[in-house]
């Protein structure tokens, strides 16, 4: 039987080579407060509900 390498401490996606992180500062993070995230979510939900009420499916 072939032995499998153990990647201890690594995320499975990183170990499989699906994600490559070459530099720590390479990825920019979006900083969003929890209140802003909830407000944006509620605004999107309200917009979708309003569109469904105003434009019902044929």
Curated annotation (Swiss-Prot):
It comes from the Archaea. This is Preprotein translocase subunit SecG. One of its GO terms (biological process) is protein transport. Residues 1-33 are cytoplasmic. Component of the protein translocase complex. Heterotrimer consisting of alpha (SecY), beta (SecG) and gamma (SecE) subunits. Can form oligomers of the heterotrimer. It holds the Pfam family Sec61_beta. Keywords: Cell membrane, Membrane, Protein transport, Translocation, Transmembrane, Transmembrane helix, Transport. Belongs to the SEC61-beta family. Involved in protein export. The function of the beta subunit is unknown, but it may be involved in stabilization of the trimeric complex. It is a single-pass membrane protein. GO terms for cellular component: plasma membrane. The chain crosses the membrane at residues 34-55. It is found in: Cell membrane. Residues 56-58 are extracellular. Signal peptide: none annotated.
